[in-house]
A protein has these predicted regions:
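Small/aliphatic-rich secondary-structure junction motif
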Residues: 2-57, 80, 84-89
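Residue-level recognition of beta-strand->loop/alpha-helix junctions
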Residues: 40, 92-94, 148
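Hydrophobic alpha-helical membrane-association signature
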Residues: 21, 70-73, 98
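Short, well-ordered secondary-structure micro-motifs
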Residues: 21, 48-51, 100-103, 126-128
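Gly/Ser-rich helix-loop-strand patches that form or flank binding pockets
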Residues: 27, 104-149
């Protein structure tokens, strides 16, 4: 049984492997004439509700800068794809875990394939935060294609 995907969702972070996923998705979308959505998640702020948060405006600035940087990167990817005559929608989700955000957006846009890098974080961050790719693989009701470096 062959599957022809109609709408591909690509989840990115700041890792080089996620940009490789965009390149793979671009080729697949062109071959299949599929819609393409590129997304990023600004995760739940771990300092919400902590007294320290009130005295640390730098933390608020950090999240505002992270959001601005993510939106700029999405816009840059969208513009690069447009130069190659490929239209892509971009989405930035805030305040949820990455895996929840990815699955939510896939449902929201009607994606029938999720593409993402095999990992974004390494070392202790990966251990503490868990594997986003593994969580999406486990929870997604649609196929997930993991891109390796």
């Amino acid at each position: 049984m062959s599957q022809s995907y109609q709408h591909i969702l690509v989840a990115i972070d700041e890792s080089p492997i996620s940009y490789a996923a965009v390149e793979q998705a671009k080729c697949l979308a062109q071959d299949l004439q599929a819609k393409l959505t590129i997304m990023s998640v600004i995760a739940v702020d771990p300092f919400v509700g902590v007294d320290f948060y009130k005295v640390a405006p730098a933390i608020t600035d950090y999240f505002m800068q992270a959001e601005s940087h993510a939106q700029n990167r999405l816009n840059e990817i969208q513009a690069n794809l447009a130069r190659e005559n490929l239209s892509a929608q971009v989405k930035l989700i805030r305040g949820v875990t990455p895996s929840e955000g990815i699955i939510h957006v896939a449902d929201e846009v009607g994606a029938d394939l999720i593409m993402m890098g095999s990992h974004g974080r390494t070392g202790l961050q990966k251990l503490m935060l868990g594997s986003v790719a593994q969580n999406v693989l486990t929870q997604s009701p649609i196929p997930v294609l993991i891109v390796k470096a």
